[in-house]
From Swiss-Prot:
Lineage of the organism: Bacteria, Pseudomonadati, Pseudomonadota, Gammaproteobacteria, Moraxellales
Quaternary data: Heterooctamer of four alpha and four beta subunits.
Cleaved signal peptide residues: none
This protein's name: Aspartate 1-decarboxylase
Modification Pyruvic acid (Ser) occurs at: S25
GO biological process: alanine biosynthetic process; pantothenate biosynthetic process
Amino acid sequence: MLSRLLKCKIHRAVVTHAELHYEGSCAIDGVLMDLAGIREYEEIHVWNVTNGKRFTTYAIRGEDNSGIISVNGGAAHQADVGDLVIIATFGDFTEAEANVHKPRLVYANPDNTVNHTANCIPVQVA
């Protein structure tokens, strides 16, 4: 049996564009994509921290070091410029793979440069 686990995420990126009439997708700065391990055209989940909306689309590569996070097509109704978002992908892993898997986590600064990276999420305390 396979388990679906978090493969990677870009945490607290800021939406720079919302292009309703652009052909679907979400353009992501290529540097962020590479660090997170997101492939072009890969399915992504976008969780809007600002308004609580969640949607699924696919990633396209934005210009390296541009800071672009552009929500395109119909998904542009789900995010406004300036919104904080989390962009995540998931993968299916065998039991052996799941036992050793560590996600790739990229934490963004407000200008969508990299603050830091990690491979585990801190324990949440009460």
